[in-house]
Amino acid sequence: MKTAFFQPDIPTQPNDHKILGNVLPGADALAISEISEQNQNLTVVVTPDTRSAVRLSRVLSELSSQDVCLFPDWETLPYDTFSPHQEIISSRLSALFHLQNAKKGIFLLPISTLMQRLCPPQYLQHNVLLIKKGDRLVIDKMRLQLEAAGYRAVEQVLEHGEYAVRGALLDLFPMGSAVPFRLDFFDDEIDSIRTFDVDTQRTLDEISSINLLPAHEFPTDDKGIEFFRAQFRETFGEIRRDPEHIYQQISKGTLISGIEYWQPLFFAEMATLFDYLPEQTLFVDMENNQTQGERFYQDAKQRYEQRKVDPMRPLLSPEKLWLNVDEVNRRLKSYPRITFKAEKVRSSVRQKNLPVAALPEVTIQSQQKEPLGQLRQFIEHFKGNVLFSVETEGRRETLLDLLSPLKLKPKQIQSLEQIENEKFSLLVSSLEQGFIIEQSLPVAIIGEANLLGKRIQQRSRDKRKTINPDTLVRNLAELKIGQPVVHLDHGVGRYGGLVTLDTGGIKAEYLLLNYANESKLYVPVTSLHLISRYVGGSDESAPLHKLGNEAWAKSRQKAAEKIRDVAAELLDVYAQREAKKGFAFKYDREEFQQFSATFPFEETYDQEMAINAVISDMCQPKAMDRLVCGDVGFGKTEVAMRAAFLAVMNHKQVAVLVPTTLLAQQHYENFKDRFANLPVNVEVLSRFKTAKEQKQILENLAEGKVDILIGTHKLIQSDVKFNDLGLLIIDEEHRFGVGQKEKIKQLRANIDILTLTATPIPRTLNMAMNGIRDLSIISTPPARRLSIKTFVRQNDDLVVREAILREILRGGQVYYLHNDVASIENTAEKLTALVPEARVIVGHGQMRERELERVMSDFYHQRYNVLVCSTIIETGIDVPTANTIIIERADHFGLAQLHQLRGRVGRSHHQAYAYLLTPPPKMMTKDAERRLDALENLDNLGAGFILATHDLEIRGAGELLGNEQSGQIESIGFSLYMELLDAAVKALKEGREPSLEELTQQQADIELRVPALLPDDYLGDVNMRLSFYKRIAAAESKAELDELKVELIDRFGLLPDATKNLLQITELRLLVEPLNVVRIDAGTQGGFIEFSAKAQVNPDKFIQLIQKEPIVYRFDGPFKFKFMKDLSDNKVRLEFVVDLLRTIAA
């Protein structure tokens, strides 16, 4: 900001301490920005808590031209049994590393973090490794260096501090780096360093060098552990021999949770942040820091007293881990500093006041006769310029609407420097609390909080990357030994692992399946397309078939007959839908791209696929009916907005139907936001509007003056008349009642319909999978960095208190779910007594609606930080600061519901926690235990879709699909049922009767006696190998195989011969599919190709071959074509068979 609004008096000498008074709420960021611009050195800002540090870093990033760095807190409680998330350690190490050379900029941290003792600067200096392209480095030596630096060896690199070695490739994700890297070695030289995408694992850009920081804030190599042991013995004396004792655990290299609280034992002497700072650093200190610092230290002492009694975890005293406030003050005397005070101070050499004044009351009072009275009065009497600050583009539109009665049209400016040129201006920024700058021409800054009451501090969401929703249901990657699988020809067996067998000197890998009576079946990996996971009931109730027995064939025959009827019924519905004529929307590429460009995040792969599918549906003349299924917070709303944009640009109206008023309000704000710069009128029908306003909206709707209308079931009442409705968007359809669904059906006649859902309830999942509705899955996990940590715990006051404290101390909020309205108030009282630090409020569905809105709104605006609630929050509003959910009696909920509830948290850049509280195991059903296990283990997937299929396994298919079908599914498994159904629908569409032979069509049996596998020294992880085998076997074209080949080379290095053979044999299978070949067999002396009786091949090809080389070729019976030739070389044999088949197929 070039026009300084006040001249700060910058102290430069040690212990030169100035006071800046009159720093009103909101003005602190402006004052810091001015100070750091004028200061020639680094400015360190110390805040009373994490929340204010986060707020200031957000505002300063917008206002200041300086680099702004937030040094994060561990986000754990003193002496916690949790460790900080890797992401936090990564940011801290990176900040400390760069701090040593920082000359200027703003460095923010809360007082509790300034009090923390840290690793000494030498630790980082000596343990940073610079790796450059062209360096000579033995890969095994590099592996040892990584181990010594605390990096974890994994199969696939996903998080900071991990590495993986595959042949000549080394993947690693250095601490402090935004992306992971892949190093390609040629002998002992680094041939290339490339970044790669965590989700697809494919490489991106080439770079020349990387800095490798250690993986922890303490050394974990042998020397470090040895030093720890000596210090531990010296500190605590006698050691228990119990293997669970922390000393024994760390001695054998186990980094236990909460190990950070023994960090001083890894160093001869600890440092503090002061040891990292340049001498001339200027400190800016907030008024409440002393009080908060003392409170934190007292809290640490109290927790030390409570916890030091655990003989397995003897604790270090607080002074070993933190400085107390007196020590901090003493250290601060070595630096120049400025302390902010809210009150005015008496002016002197040391003390100065910030030239600002408080705004008078300008709140909009919607209940009053003249809502804008106070604002009007202020503007009429104020002699200077007025700047309105709003947080987003959409709120800018809302503000302009609000100001229209005053005939005000503020000019939008891009930065504070432009204030002076305009009487009324408007800035999109995070300055939410206003004040008046007193100068020759005063400036009044009016923030949203001044006009609308305190608003929430939004935390930015992360840009999200994506994984391809790889045939999740049929994928074998999750298989565990002993789980049931279905073989198309032999029925249901149990998975026994991958085994390598040597037959006639040729190594090949097989999938071992165990059947009844201890029979074993070895399935070659080239036939994995015949295998699918058994889904359809619990593992225990899955059948176990006998090999070579008729039972399986009968089950399959029976299921196939039933499936034919289902397919016919489906097609009937499908045909009716196809016959429905819709409106073919026109697509203007340029307009659409301009709108898309205003989306503030990067679209994920799935999101793009879903958007493209929706747009392409809308441009067809038939009516769209598409289900977009994606987890809570995965960007389904953006898909809906793009569809709405296309409809509105085609002069059609859009209705958005949502289950709750609060959700309607939130969608309204989001839509307003996105359509802010367009001539689009967005309205909402909800109880927030007066009867008069609702009437006006309905009149405008009928006249076509409203483009997008958002609302609850009010939208489908008979008095709502659209002028020209073109698109209906339904959010969470399963939440509407039967009567409401009927009304929606009547609306459906010929308009395009887009349904959004977070948990595909399996019935809708099935319909979508069968193509009655088109389905797009957005399975992109929320930013992979911080998935939701889920704990299943027996209900215990200590667990609850810790969980709530951990969250509110980092400035967050907690949902406490107690699903019994009769006792909910008692629970709230109990919590208030248990955690007096919390501000508790109650919300449930039996409250009067107005009251519930107020509760939710108060929680949203952070007036309370614990909401004791019923399942009303299931489709709640987005509260980005709520990052812990505690669910009582979690064993009473279904999987989909628990998943949905858990999705209410984890929407910002903080680690989110879900605690599922249960009674003792004796009081739970087996199913409930399995549900909770599934949820605890699925914390890192875009799991809504996967959970729906898990639900099919746990609940069985019966209650989901109606009993008629469930019998068939129990007997043959869900995956196979779906495959057969697909084939039946396809046949009927083409006007053919589906035959069982066709449904269970055999693929050619190919035996060429060459090694064809993914060797385990090439791809070590069994599940990943299984997954690739399945993907190779399921490939449907040469292009797909080529793509897999590129991916294998990119991720694991050059292909071994056996893998080249595997891909070539698969290509051969694709080549012979249309020829109806039953078997191909070739050995060292020749072989044969056997055709099925219904093969249709051109006999001329065979005649030409026999005439050309009668010694080599001949027929043996009507269906077997033989060749005799020396084929002892594997490569020659493979190429000969491929060429021969190409000739026949041509």
UniProtKB/Swiss-Prot annotation:
Span of the annotated motif DEEH box: 731-734
GO biological process, one term: transcription-coupled nucleotide-excision repair, DNA damage recognition
Ligand binding (ATP): 630-637
Record-linked InterPro entries: CarD-like/TRCF_RID, CarD-like/TRCF_RID_sf, DEAD/DEAH_box_helicase_dom, Helicase_ATP-bd, Helicase_C-like, Mfd, MFD_D3, P-loop_NTPase
Compartments in which it is found: Cytoplasm
Task performed by this protein: Couples transcription and DNA repair by recognizing RNA polymerase (RNAP) stalled at DNA lesions. Mediates ATP-dependent release of RNAP and its truncated transcript from the DNA, and recruitment of nucleotide excision repair machinery to the damaged site.
Family as reported in the entry's similarity comment: In the N-terminal section; belongs to the UvrB family.
Record-given protein name: Transcription-repair-coupling factor
Organism annotation: Haemophilus influenzae (strain ATCC 51907 / DSM 11121 / KW20 / Rd)
